[in-house]
Amino acid sequence: NDRLFASATIMRSLWAGETVSTAAPVRTVEARLHTRPTQPPLLLGAALTPATAEWLGGWADGLITVATPKGDHAKVAGAFRHGGGEGKPMYLKVDLSYARTDEEARSGAWDQWRANVYPAAVLENLRTPGEFEALEDLAGPRMVFEKIRISADPKDHVRWLRTDIDLGFTHLYLHNVNRNQETFIEDFGNEVLPEIFG
């Protein structure tokens, strides 16, 4: 967290036109932007846990997190607001598997997403494709189905996304994890998004 906050402070100083030299925890020597943006970009903080989100609320310009079928992202959003993020934008990445049948949605999720069910602490230590494949063999379908929203019913997705909006998420990024992107785009464009945004 110290490195993250120090990096954010350095970026903000650079965007303000300052020359920055720091020793620790991030070293910079007379860093300077020769061309600055007219408007500094938002500095979003990424959080998967309420503790990190609460810490980010006090200094980040916004939050980005990942939706979970169990609704853990509601706790993350609440902690961000509690920590000082009230009124700041919140971005949500929604991993989902949509197809026209539940079986296709489940099999697409299993086929494409089973390597992504492990925590970052495990994944960041894998070095070869073989290590990823070995890990995939240990994943069961239930592990995948607990990590993403899976349904062939557009009404389920409408309900879930409305809940996300009610939680205060201002930007939703929908990621259909299976390969059937054409059906996803067509059906969400015709049946899901109009229900949410009119």
Where in this protein do the model-derived segments appear?
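Active-site-adjacent structural elements that line small-molecule/cofactor binding pockets in enzymes
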Residues: 1-198
